[in-house]
Amino acid sequence: MVQAIVKREKWQTRRVVKPQPKAEKFSAIVRCDDFLLARFWSRRPYPRIDDVRARFIPGDILWVRETWQHTKVLNLHPTDANYGYVYRADGREWEDIEGWKWKPSIFMPKEACRLFLKIKNVRNERLQSISEADARAEGFDSVDSCFALWQKLNGIESLAANPWVWVYDFEVIPKP
């Protein structure tokens, strides 16, 4: 999905609402000082309201972690080297030479980050409510291909559970 962000083919993502509300109906997103709450309600078996806090709000800036590797960039002279980073998502094959190996995204330091995202909009919906337009905004050709990856990442039963998800629209911005 990093490749889709780099190519500007992805500008939306979904994350499971945690914890999942026990109340089944969505009421509203409530803006508090520096956070958002999704309010859910139900009348059976008794009146109930569940408030769930969004992890991000519009204006938040996130940095994208990706598989990366240190590299040595040689200028005019071999002794005049500086160190930089290369990214597996660029599709180039870099050799594992002298200990320069691919490192998992979870170990990426912020200084190595090249992609920063600014949250533009937050909403929530049931997973299976995704539209074809939203699937394209997620970087997919269709809803079916979006669901296929969802099941691969979250398990076969996750699609049938049809959880509430946060929908985050974002834009790529220069390094802040």
Mark where each language-model region is.
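Secondary-structure transition motif
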Residues: 1-176
